[in-house]
């Protein structure tokens, strides 16, 4: 049920009111910094739109709710691409829209990272969300509202705020360590790991490889600790070791640009010099482009000084 979701009381009230209005179709933009929380709200609304047991909410235990949770519901479609949903995916959505509902009820289309969509794909999507078919609900997820204006003009906005340290039941120091990422914090709370114990920056490559092989919170924390060790030691690290640090990251990520960008984002949050942050963010944002990743990482690490 909506009441079981921690935080964002206003967002929950908005969705409940939408359900009470008996809307027959719609397009929404859920936006905020916590991607996992955006998806949690999107799936919660999807459950409420398809739940057979509960009115203006979801029970969480019926067959429909359970299949939404496991992403196996016949009328739930999720589209994503780390570099932005492509035109071919939008064409797939168009085909799906042209067919009948599998289960005879509402259909939910969740599109992730819509702020990354290129203009061609966004314009193609626009044709579908202008006048959705009865029973079709589009939920667009985005980190920000840097989205094609015509798409925004045809959507309802819902800001999903990051959960606070108090809501997550941790200290502000712990909250800052994870940059407020709720999913990681909840996983960390189950481990008993001491965040005060450090990890050496020169082991960053091994920590990344371990995480890629087994992506759990224990291995993720080791990456964070290693990055923090590099940051606090940066004034005492020579040029050769700096380049070695960047190369260790490059060879370990195996051209995984999403993880590379996440690592750079974490480092950006450690910087207090706002002039330098601007340059770092510019370099970080180039990672998603088809440019030399190894060179970008070297430039990024060099800019930290």
Residues of each region from the PLM?
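ATP/adenylate-binding site constellation spanning eukaryotic-like Ser/Thr protein kinases
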Residues: 73, 122, 144
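Charged, glycine-rich active-site and insertion segments that engage polyanionic ligands
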Residues: 1-48, 55, 64-67, 134-137, ...
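Conserved beta-strand positions
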Residues: 78-79, 111, 160
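Short, well-ordered alpha-helices that flank and scaffold nucleotide-derived cofactor binding pockets
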Residues: 47, 51, 127-130
